[in-house]
């Protein structure tokens, strides 16, 4: 079971380019077993993790280049840990770092 502890917002698409956001995601994905994971706010809301009214998805895995756009693997963890899908990085509004406790 995950306990959600807010750390910080590390990317904001209103103030950052897709290239900058991709660079941040690649940096975090490169760290293995560091106790952190990422959640993102998307335009196509999928799961409300923290009850705050912010609709979030959890990002995990690698950055991929697919059909001319950067994408990342995402999994909705609250209801079905195995429910994975591709997220377009261009749809990300902001990225939050959480700590697994």
Task: Label each PLM-derived region with a short phrase.
Residues 1-58, 77-101:
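Short glycine-rich, low-complexity segments
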Residues 69-74:
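Short aromatic-glycine-enriched beta-strand elements
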């Amino acid at each position: 079971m995950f306990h959600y502890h807010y750390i910080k917002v590390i990317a904001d698409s209103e103030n950052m380019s897709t290239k900058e956001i991709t660079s941040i995601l690649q940096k975090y994905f490169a760290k293995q077993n560091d106790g952190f994971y990422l959640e993102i706010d998307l335009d196509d809301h999928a799961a409300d993790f923290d009850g705050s009214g912010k609709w979030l998805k959890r990002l995990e895995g690698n950055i991929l280049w697919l059909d001319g756009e950067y994408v990342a693997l995402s999994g909705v963890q609250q209801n079905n840990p195995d429910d994975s899908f591709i997220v377009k990085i261009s749809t990300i509004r902001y990225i939050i770092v959480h700590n697994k406790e």
